[in-house]
């Protein structure tokens, strides 16, 4: 009866998520990289429609280092759907995010039952770094969803080693192929399955001959997965197979970015190449909701308490999740890659973390079952923490991806000052509305200005402003002569140009973006200055 309740709760949550996506996907601002990514998708479409003769996609900026799975679909949908292209991308990205949540539910269900599956789904659903990001982080969330499905099939396959049914191998290969069709980071999924097979050989096989047979049989069973993964990667990332060293070039670029950029670490400006090894851990500890962290703490304590009673040979599915969690985290600690934008580039580990945390909370309920008062207190704590997170996400809408928990600072304003704020400049969607309203009011009082064109400087990509402004405004690169200035407050870019503040986009008393009127400024006051590092 209880299990059926959790199943109904999960389905109800899925339904609520679908409604949420359909009602809000048009409310999210365009992110910095969306234009170049969409152009890349259009160029890939030209590559195929031209019979492989138009290869401009592989000379466009550095986008050839990435797969175009998402962008190719978006470029195709643009031709057939009667929607604005950016709305198409945001809806498609949200669909990927939703698919990732299905994978988390199914994975946790396979490991620990309906209650844990519901809790894992709920945890991911209230994580702003996933649900808030899934509309605008088109590359990160789509990749994370594919990796979540690769993990799901890895879990299923772990129960069948060394003789893996063909249909499972093909499904695993498809998930990995789609992931590689987005980023070279999909190679992590390949590493996961390799580690799993090696651990299975060590735990289950007897003599050396048996171990070799077990390993060989596993390899043979996985060959179809490798074949379909390679084919899908080649379709969505053709550059990868156009040179024998292309995959290695992409892998190197993944871990060592070659450009000058800063990030925020507890109030300090830090070059992305000099971030501490704990950068990702620091951001996970403040970007995940408190209830999520409680789940991770619970699963860690459970493992410590029951470590001696765990039969590793029977725990390959659980080991699969552990591999998916530990491999990228250990990679960051060892390789110390250039990192920025908080957890963005490692969004793909959030599903595995949600699985572990959901199981942790579920097991904690079981352990506390004999202790009524403790159990009720634990449940009350979980409900309060979850409610607080949901309220915070509601207030932040549509900027849920900026969510920070209470460990990040005394309040949200302090958190987005000391850590990365609106790095995608998505809040410009509301900043442009403030500017248009300001000019509307001015033109009502001064009808002679109706035909005037105003120049606007934007601390973001130009199209993020022009996409929402009408013909009265012209986005300019000449910041000195600009009439108006729009910027998110991330990294103090709003302070680069002076001007009278005529509009502020705020959430939880924290400014996310500003609009400045610069028309009355003269001389040196019109010149840009370096963003202060305070």
What do these predicted ranges mean?
Residues 6-12, 104-126, 145, 162-167, ...:
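Transmembrane-helix signature of polytopic, membrane-embedded enzymes
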Residues 27, 70, 238-241, 247-255, ...:
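Catalytic lumenal/periplasmic loop and adjoining terminal transmembrane helix
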Residues 31-32, 129, 135-142:
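Short acidic/glycine- and proline-prone juxtamembrane loop motifs at membrane-interface regions
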Residues 47-50, 66-68, 72, 79-82, ...:
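Transmembrane-lumen/periplasm boundary regions of multi-pass, lipid-linked membrane glycan transferases
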Residues 68, 72, 80-102, 121, ...:
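Loop-to-helix entry region of an early transmembrane alpha helix in multi-pass inner-membrane enzymes
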Residues 91-111, 149-153, 304-308:
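Transmembrane-helix motifs of polytopic, lipid-linked glycan transferases
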Residues 120-125, 132, 148, 152, ...:
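Short helix- or helix-capping micro-motifs
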Residues 150-169, 203:
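Membrane-interface transmembrane helices that cradle and orient dolichyl/undecaprenyl
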């Amino acid at each position: 009866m209880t299990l059926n309740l959790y199943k109904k709760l999960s389905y109800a949550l899925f339904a609520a998520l679908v409604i949420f996506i359909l009602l809000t996907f048009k409310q999210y601002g365009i992110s910095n990289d969306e234009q170049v990514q969409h152009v890349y998708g259009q160029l890939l479409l030209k590559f195929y429609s031209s019979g492989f003769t138009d290869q401009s996609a592989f000379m466009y900026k550095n986008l050839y280092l990435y797969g175009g799975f998402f962008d190719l679909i978006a470029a195709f949908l643009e031709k057939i759907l009667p929607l604005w292209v950016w709305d198409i991308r945001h809806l498609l990205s949200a669909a990927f995010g939703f698919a990732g949540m299905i994978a988390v539910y199914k994975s946790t269900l396979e490991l620990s039952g309906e209650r844990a599956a519901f809790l894992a789904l709920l945890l991911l659903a209230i994580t702003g770094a996933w649900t808030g990001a899934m509309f605008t982080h088109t590359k990160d969330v789509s990749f994370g969803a594919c990796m979540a499905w690769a993990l799901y099939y890895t879990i299923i396959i772990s129960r069948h080693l060394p003789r893996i049914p063909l249909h499972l191998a093909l499904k695993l290969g498809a998930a990995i192929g789609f992931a590689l069709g987005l980023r070279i980071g999909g190679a992590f999924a390949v590493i996961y399955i390799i580690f799993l097979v090696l651990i299975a050989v060590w735990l289950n096989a007897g003599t050396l001959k048996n171990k070799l047979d077990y390993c060989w049989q596993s390899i043979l069973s996985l060959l179809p997965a490798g074949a379909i993964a390679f084919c899908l990667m080649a379709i969505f990332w053709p550059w990868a197979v156009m040179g024998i060293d292309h995959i290695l070039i992409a892998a190197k670029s993944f871990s060592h970015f070659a450009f000058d950029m800063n990030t925020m670490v507890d109030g300090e400006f830090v070059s992305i190449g000099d971030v501490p090894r704990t950068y990702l851990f620091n951001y996970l500890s403040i970007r995940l909701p408190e209830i999520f962290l409680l789940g991770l703490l619970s699963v860690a304590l459970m493992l410590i308490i029951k470590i001696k009673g765990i039969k590793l040979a029977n725990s390959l599915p659980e080991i699969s999740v552990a591999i998916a969690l530990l491999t990228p985290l250990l990679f960051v600690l060892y390789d110390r890659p250039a990192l920025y934008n908080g957890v963005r580039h490692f969004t793909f580990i959030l599903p595995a973390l949600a699985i572990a945390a959901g199981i942790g909370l579920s097991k904690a309920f079981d352990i506390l079952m004999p202790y009524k008062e403790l159990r009720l207190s634990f449940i009350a704590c979980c409900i309060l923490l979850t409610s607080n997170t949901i309220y915070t996400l509601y207030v932040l809408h549509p900027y849920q991806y900026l969510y920070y928990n209470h460990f990040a600072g005394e309040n949200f304003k302090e958190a987005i000052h000391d850590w990365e704020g609106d790095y995608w400049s998505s809040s410009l969607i509301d900043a442009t509305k403030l500017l248009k309203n300001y000019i509307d009011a001015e033109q009502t009082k001064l009808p002679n200005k109706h035909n005037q064109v105003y120049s606007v400087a934007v601390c973001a990509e130009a199209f993020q402003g022009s996409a929402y402004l009408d013909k009265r405004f012209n986005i300019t690169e000449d910041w000195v002569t600009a009439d108006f200035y729009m910027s998110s407050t991330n990294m103090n870019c709003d302070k680069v140009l002076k001007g009278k503040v005529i509009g502020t986009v705020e959430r939880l008393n924290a400014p996310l973006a500003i609009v400045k009127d610069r028309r009355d400024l003269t001389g040196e006051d019109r010149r840009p200055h370096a963003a202060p590092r305070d």
